[in-house]
Amino acid sequence: MRVVGVEQDQREFAEFYAAAWDDCLRIVMVGVGDRALAEDLVAEAFTRAWASWRKVGGFAEPRAWVIRCALNAHVSWWRRHRREVALGSHDTTAATSQDPGLDTSLVAALRRLPVRQRQVIALRLLLDLDTATTAEMLGMSGSTVTTHLHRACVALRRDIPARNDQERVQ
């Protein structure tokens, strides 16, 4: 009888994986700016999700759990590798320019935002989570989420039209 439960878990997880992979990858890419690293982090997060699928599958937003797990893995990765990374060692714009559905000027503008603002933008606008869920995922209050979202939108409005004006002049 346990086999039936395992098969159902496998089927549910496979459906979740197929439906959530692209969203998770794009949101993590916004956070880390490197497609290869984002793919590794998302793969690790999905591996952890499968290992705890009975728990994770019961969450209201399992995608949010996977994204949070991937972003936490990025923090851990950065702590291990920060001494090895040379400033300016690679161009992240090239990594994102080949991705369909991503506007490179928007990705560049998002990368200039502080990390918390990027995370709020990714969760609230790209993943369409509500303020309370975003706040819980990021470990902050709902009003802090709203403040970060407002500041990020102001910065993006200021940055993106300026880039568009420069392109028209050239």
Language model features with spans:
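A short, charge-rich alpha-helical start-of-domain segment used by transcription regulators
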Residues: 2-25, 36-42
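C-terminal flanking helix
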Residues: 21, 25, 46, 114, ...
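Short, small-hydrophobic-rich alpha-helical interface motif
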Residues: 24, 28, 38-49, 69, ...
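Internal acidic/polar
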Residues: 76, 83-110, 130, 165-169
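Helix-turn-helix DNA-binding module
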Residues: 111, 115, 127-147, 154-158
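A short pre-motif secondary-structure segment
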Residues: 120-124
